[in-house]
A protein has these predicted regions:
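Active-site-proximal beta-strand/loop segments in catalytic clefts of secreted hydrolases
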Residues: 20-23, 67, 79-82, 101, ...
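Extracytoplasmic/secreted proteins, especially bacterial periplasmic and envelope-associated proteins
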Residues: 40-44, 48, 90, 94, ...
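An acidic, glycine-rich "communication" segment
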Residues: 28-29, 114-194
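Aromatic-Pro/Gly-enriched surface loop or interdomain linker
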Residues: 1-76, 80-83
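Short alpha-beta junction capping motif
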Residues: 17, 76-116
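Loop/turn elements at helix/coil->beta-strand transitions in domains of secreted/extracellular proteins
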Residues: 13-15, 72-77, 100-105, 130-131, ...
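Short, low-complexity, polar/charged sequence segments that are solvent-exposed and flexible
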Residues: 36-41, 96-99, 125-126, 151-154
């Protein structure tokens, strides 16, 4: 487990990696798909962020339900494998309020048209008058820290080692980076699909 210096006096001002816990169809034992790679990937992200930036980064990631009022204390949240997410009405309202109050959610690691369709339907409940926008390679987000020459597709290590391909299923060969924006043009959700 990586460790780094952390000034606990500034714990509430530090960046803290927060994962969204949600209900889904399917999952892993008593945990849903939201639990994939937890807490290792969250800790790795936090460690690398403090290593590569001058940010004060909290060393203990956490997960929160969308209906937990603590979500408003964290401007960045992460959602993994949401292809079969199922939001309650209360979660839809909480997510919408989170975005209206300045929050941002990064969505990652879901594959294929069936998962996209279900995710899209759930997000249309949050954003009934908005459509996700496909982000072109020229978008600044692909050039902020590293100047990317192509949109990366990150496969599971098993697929890469077994088949030498960067997609996980036949209907997931094309990588998509999409986003939802608010009325002011602020990106509120980045969606990494395929």
């Amino acid at each position: 487990v990586p460790v780094w210096d952390f000034d606990k006096a500034f714990a509430t001002e530090a960046f803290r990696f927060v994962r969204v816990r949600y209900n889904s169809i399917g999952g892993y034992g008593p945990f849903g798909k939201w639990f994939t790679d937890y807490p290792d990937s969250d800790l790795n992200f936090s460690f690398r962020l403090q290593q590569l930036t001058t940010m004060n980064v909290h060393p203990e990631p956490l997960y929160l339900d969308l209906t937990d009022p603590k979500i408003f204390d964290y401007p960045f949240m992460y959602m993994i494998e949401p292809g079969f997410i199922w939001l309650s009405d209360a979660e839809v309202l909480a997510m919408r309020e989170y975005f209206e109050r300045g929050g941002f959610i990064m969505v990652d690691d879901f594959w294929g048209e069936e998962e996209w369709y279900n995710f899209y339907i759930q997000m249309k409940r949050v954003f009934p008058k908005r459509e996700p926008v496909d982000l072109p390679l020229e978008h600044p987000i692909f050039h902020l820290v590293y100047d990317l020459e192509k949109k990366p597709q990150v496969p599971s290590i098993h697929n890469w080692m077994r088949y030498g391909v960067t997609y996980e299923r036949p209907d997931a060969k094309e990588v998509h980076y999409r986003a939802f924006f608010d009325d002011g043009g602020r990106m509120v959700m980045m969606i990494c699909h395929n």
